[in-house]
Amino acid sequence: MSNGKITQVIGPVIDVEFEAGELPEIYYALKVSNPSLGDEPWNLVAEVAQHLGENTVRAIAMDSTDGLVRGQEVLNTGRQISVPVGRGTLGRILNVIGEPVDEQGPVETDTTWEIHRPTPEFVDQSTKVEAFETGIKVVDLLAPYARGGKIGLFGGAGVGKTVLIMELIHNIAKKHGGFSVFAGVGERTREGNDLWNEMKESNVLDKTALVYGQMNEPPGARARVALSALTVAEYFRDQENQDVLLFVDNIFRFTQAGSEVSALLGRIPSAVGYQPTLSTEMGELQERITTTKNGSITSVQAIYVPADDLTDPAPATTFAHLDATTVLSRQIAELGIYPAVDPLDSSSRILDPQVLGEEHYQVARDVQYVLQRYKDLQDIIAILGMDELSEEDKQTVSRARKIQRFLSQPFHVAEIFTGTPGKYVELSETIRGFKEIVEGKHDSVPEQAFYMAGGIDEVLENAAKMAS
């Protein structure tokens, strides 16, 4: 295989000329020495994105291109970007090309897998449906997650997507004990660091592989880091027959990175300036996240919603792939109710009596009915006040406000900020608590007792303390 030479550098994109008949294939990794990154040779990896003709390829760099010059030699590796897979990745932080960035020495695995992989065959996919308990009341009751499903956490800036993801990792590692893979795609480095320290303190790090491509990295790294993390998860599913959890924070940044390089690759932008290949790229990633007969990948994806607009092409394209959506609402966060999950906007494909059982389904629907009725009455209350409502409506409003507060819950991972110990609430406790509120058993309990409590028994303890 012959080497090529750089003919042009445009931001994160480089053009490389090879000899006739020696062109690397699309997605192949190229290597070049970038003195600004360090002294080691071939320290910058780029991925071939286009064949331009005249023996030239256009490649997207996975790190800074500052310091590259025309005429520099480029190595064709003859294969795609490959990342280490297997148990050696647990407890480690990798970057997009599979190198450890936690200063803990090399990753000890025997196997590497290429990051662009085919989707599992249709016949290998499993169709069994079962719910997956998270210990978070609002999620388990109203928008339950399916094992092997895809879950989207929608929310604008600062409503608590990352905290919710960290709590899910905590609860699942403690209760479920399976392996998790966390893909940090274009988010804050501080949050990545916090997550690592948090996991270390709560002893879940040895069950988790972390793959980071943060906000400060070039778009090439942010557009590929989700695939690197997914490849690590696929190994556990396919080779070790595990039920794996894949957390992606944030899937919007994957789309955003694609749109940053799209114009440099000469593609004509589509709606709102996004890349024309938006749904194809999203489909290639999402279709690999699935349950096979060997094991499953359950994925929880935080989805930033630009300007709180759910019809923006990036969140709208992601919607099509999801089994459950957990929508975080700024209005609920403003009321001081955390997790700020919107109980009426969030939905799940498995909220069905045949999957969850009749009692769970009925309680969930009753809770939604009471909350919806309260929402409908809010205009009347705002204009005429509570006194104009019928006795029945007053009772509905009172119960709805209790339900709203009971949907809040103290988190383990927020304990250091709030000083309140976190609570994991079993599904049976959640159903019992909400059923009793809807049936009117706690109409005499003050609504403040329901705020930031775990199960219904804790609410009654709070009420007793308030009374004394």
From Swiss-Prot:
Keywords: ATP synthesis, ATP-binding, Cell inner membrane, Cell membrane, CF(1), Hydrogen ion transport, Ion transport, Membrane, Nucleotide-binding, Translocase, Transport. F-type ATPases have 2 components, CF(1) - the catalytic core - and CF(0) - the membrane proton channel. CF(1) has five subunits: alpha(3), beta(3), gamma(1), delta(1), epsilon(1). CF(0) has three main subunits: a(1), b(2) and c(9-12). The alpha and beta chains form an alternating ring which encloses part of the gamma chain. CF(1) is attached to CF(0) by a central stalk formed by the gamma and epsilon chains, while a peripheral stalk is formed by the delta and b chains. This is ATP synthase subunit beta 1. Belongs to the ATPase alpha/beta chains family. It is a peripheral membrane protein. It comes from the Bacteria. It catalyses: ATP + H2O + 4 H(+)(in) = ADP + phosphate + 5 H(+)(out). The gene is atpD1. It comes from Syntrophotalea carbinolica (strain DSM 2380 / NBRC 103641 / GraBd1). HAMAP family: ATP_synth_beta_bact (MF_01347). ATP binds at G155, G156, A157, G158, V159, G160, K161, T162. NCBIfam families: atpD (TIGR01039). Its main location: membrane. One of its GO terms (molecular function) is ATP hydrolysis activity. Produces ATP from ADP in the presence of a proton gradient across the membrane. The catalytic sites are hosted primarily by the beta subunits. Its EC number is 7.1.2.2. It is found in: Cell inner membrane. The keyword Repressor does not apply. GO terms for cellular component: plasma membrane; proton-transporting ATP synthase complex. The keyword Flavoprotein does not apply. The lineage of its organism: Bacteria, Pseudomonadati, Thermodesulfobacteriota, Desulfuromonadia, Desulfuromonadales.
